[in-house]
């Protein structure tokens, strides 16, 4: 007893105890610490961000020992978070931690339907038996599970569920007959553009089926002439609607949540997502644009992230296979998704060269939150490449050692794009907390430790993803945005010396990945940042000017400045907004419920924001590109939608779009670059495979498009006088 009292006093006298301490111990699997904290008075059911509990974190990790300890100490097994609506059982099942799921079911956890379906999928008889024994399982879900089991090959599980279903027959429903011609009118494809999901309705053996891409068809049964249910899926209903005898929409309701899908008519192009899309033979979008003096591309997506390279002689066609319009190709070692920048005859790129045996990188559309467990020794490096020849002009190693944070499988240890003003080159490497400055000839000028930047999942920060916000130069300072689970801030450093100039704390901000943008207006310059709240600061002092919410919980895109307006998007729940904010605002400019504009906001919507790629403002049109290739064009002044299309027919896109001479350039993760005509309708001009993964945003300067793949840096452009294509 005395030893226990001493231990408790020792804990209480060091730092105040909190739910966060308990969450951290549960995530780390520290059994002793969890017990100590509960003994010291921390509530075992303490709720954190989005009402998450320690039990949820332990279940998510599959730590049966911690789960058992928490339940024995009184943890409520049926508490759910308010964001994902998951209980501890849901966390365990979604990660296939079946032993944890079984334990939770044995201790009264609800969620038998999900457990039963998981047991069928995993072929786990014990899990199936526990789910069948749960009073939480209703007859409708039971019979739907039986239909699913019959499609499988596990006879023992099918027999178990069949016996349970026989004992609980469904109440007979009235037979509804839908004429064949009516069912035929429902057949076709339907799409929800915001979610990027397409559903196909077909007639198979006189019955309607519903298919989501990549999944098995589900048979539908009529409940009325226009409403159908899926016997295999509990609480699932589909309703068709339209006007004048034409079916226009399909609404899917599952568990009380509805989503509307628009009927897709036969488009004029297989790439279209709307009737405005067209396809043209490869050709320049404009005739002989005036070639201007070579302009720099000094930062992420060029000057102030505008992404515009007019007058720089960007070509509209090339061929990697034959070498046509490929000036050079230079290998860049390591894994990095940072983008190239250009000043004069120098192209600057960063990389992190790690364990050659671990090249883990996963492209595509997926939602996996688990990081790559590679904390082996890396070398963080800055390269200067000759823009004319592709030769390495110089390379400088910033640091060699182990990264302090993990990375997402679609990320790297060198995500942030460097910045230059023609004399200084500044790079930030978040996973080692280093801000480094060189002159353009590679001479080290200064290096500053800004602290490891630990970006990750807002729900559980131990799922680390890596920092990607890029530095920006403003006058004689370099500014960095450091948003993480705790301790977020915005800071300016003297460009010549690295000396700190100001720091603005962002105490209520969590991990974000966008880069700050400068907006010039009648009241002076504003530094606009994306995040769970959009904020503007005085770039001279760091003083906050205005705030705007709500926004997505994960924000990646960079704000884009136009004339006296800045455009900001977010593409993740709880809202997916597009905001057009006027320069000169002040204070809290959040809109009242139901409003879409105000004195400070030119226009907005809360449903069509995009996730990873940064929007593009070009010739009075705002283009937003979602990660699934959905391109939406808006009148930038009014927000009126001009068209919506699927670039290249869809796919995964991480690189941001750029524009030049009346053309738009889009690079997907598979390594295809699509050239599209700029304007109020979608016209695809060509597709140009690079045959390597592309995550970085291309750059345009002085006759070349610089395209970085995971393995190489390419210069795409008409051959320079006297030069031939070169491969290093």
PLM regions: where:
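Bacterial N-terminal signal peptides
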Residues: 2-12
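Ankyrin-repeat boundary/"N-cap" motif
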Residues: 16-24, 47-54, 80-87, 111-118, ...
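N-terminal segments that cap or nucleate solenoid repeat domains
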Residues: 15-50, 54, 127, 131
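Ankyrin repeat A-helix N-terminal signature
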Residues: 24-29, 57-63, 91-97, 118-124, ...
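The conserved C-terminal loop/turn that links adjacent ankyrin repeats
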Residues: 41-45, 74-78, 110, 136-138
């Amino acid at each position: 007893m005395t030893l226990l009292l001493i231990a408790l006093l020792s804990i209480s006298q060091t730092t105040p105890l909190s739910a966060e301490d308990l969450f951290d111990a549960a995530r780390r699997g520290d059994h002793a610490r969890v017990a100590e904290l509960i003994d010291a008075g921390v509530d075992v059911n303490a709720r954190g961000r989005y009402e998450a509990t320690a039990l949820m974190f332990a279940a998510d990790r599959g730590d049966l020992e911690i789960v058992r300890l928490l339940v024995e100490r009184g943890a409520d097994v049926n508490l759910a978070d308010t964001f994902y609506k998951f209980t501890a059982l849901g966390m365990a099942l979604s990660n296939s931690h079946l032993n944890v799921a079984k334990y939770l079911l044995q201790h009264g956890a609800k969620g038998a339907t999900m457990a039963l379906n998981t047991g069928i999928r995993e072929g786990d008889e014990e899990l199936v038996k526990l789910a069948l024994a749960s009073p939480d399982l209703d007859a409708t879900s039971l019979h739907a599970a039986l239909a699913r089991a019959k499609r499988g090959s596990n006879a023992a599980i099918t027999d178990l569920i069949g016996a349970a279903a026989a004992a609980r027959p469904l109440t007979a429903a009235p037979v509804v007959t839908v004429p064949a011609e009516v069912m035929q009118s429902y057949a076709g494809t339907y799409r929800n553009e915001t979610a990027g999901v397409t559903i196909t309705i077909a007639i198979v053996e006189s019955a309607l089926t519903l298919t989501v891409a990549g999944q098995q068809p589900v048979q539908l049964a009529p409940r009325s002439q226009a409403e159908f249910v899926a016997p295999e899926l509990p609480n699932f209903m589909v309703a068709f609607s339209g006007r004048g005898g034409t079916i226009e929409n399909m609404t899917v309701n599952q568990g009380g949540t509805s989503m509307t899908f628009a009927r897709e008519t036969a488009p004029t192009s297989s790439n279209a997502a709307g009737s405005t899309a067209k396809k043209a033979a490869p050709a320049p979008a404009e005739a002989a644009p005036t070639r201007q003096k070579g302009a720099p591309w000094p930062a992420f997506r060029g000057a102030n992230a505008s992404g515009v390279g007019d007058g720089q002689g960007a070509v509209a066609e090339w061929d990697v296979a034959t070498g046509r319009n490929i000036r050079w190709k230079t290998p860049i070692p390591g894994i990095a998704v940072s983008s190239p920048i250009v000043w004069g005859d120098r192209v600057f790129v960063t990389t992190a060269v790690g364990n050659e045996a671990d090249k883990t990188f996963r492209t595509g559309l997926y939602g996996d939150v688990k990081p790559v467990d590679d904390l082996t020794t890396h070398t963080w490096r800055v390269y200067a490449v000759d823009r004319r020849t592709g030769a390495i002009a110089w390379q400088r190693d910033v640091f060699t050692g182990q990264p302090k944070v993990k990375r997402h499988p679609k990320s790297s240890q060198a995500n942030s794009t460097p910045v230059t003003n023609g004399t200084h080159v500044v790079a930030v490497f978040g996973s080692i907390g280093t801000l480094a400055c060189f002159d353009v000839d590679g001479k080290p000028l200064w290096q500053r430790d800004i602290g490891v930047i630990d970006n990750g999942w807002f729900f559980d920060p131990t799922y680390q993803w890596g920092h990607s916000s890029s530095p920006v130069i403003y006058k004689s300072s370099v500014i960095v945005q450091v948003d993480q689970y705790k301790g977020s801030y915005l800071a300016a450093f003297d460009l010549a010396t690295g000396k700190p100039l100001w720091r603005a704390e962002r105490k209520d901000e969590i991990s974000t990945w966008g880069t700050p943008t400068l907006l010039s207006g009648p009241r002076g310059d504003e530094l606009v940042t994306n995040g769970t709240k959009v904020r503007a600061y005085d770039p001279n002092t760091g003083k906050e000017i205005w705030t705007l919410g709500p926004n997505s919980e994960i924000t990646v895109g960079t704000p884009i400045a136009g004339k006296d307006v800045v455009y900001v998007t977010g593409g993740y729940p709880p809202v997916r907004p597009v905001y057009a904010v006027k320069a000169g605002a002040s204070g809290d400019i959040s809109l009242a419920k139901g409003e879409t504009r105000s004195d400070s906001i030119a226009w907005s919507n809360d449903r069509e924001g995009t996730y990873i790629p940064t929007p593009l403002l070009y010739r009075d049109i705002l283009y937003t590109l979602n990660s699934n290739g959905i391109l939406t064009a808006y009148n930038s002044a009014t927000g009126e939608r001009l068209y919506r299309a699927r670039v290249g027919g869809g796919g995964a896109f991480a690189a941001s779009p750029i524009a030049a001479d009346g053309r738009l350039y889009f690079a997907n993760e598979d390594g295809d670059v699509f050239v599209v005509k700029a304007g109020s309708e979608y016209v695809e001009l060509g597709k140009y495979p690079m045959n390597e993964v592309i995550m970085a945003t291309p750059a345009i300067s002085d006759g070349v498009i610089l395209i970085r793949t995971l393995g190489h840096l390419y210069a795409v452009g008409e051959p320079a006088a006297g030069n031939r294509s070169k491969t290093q």
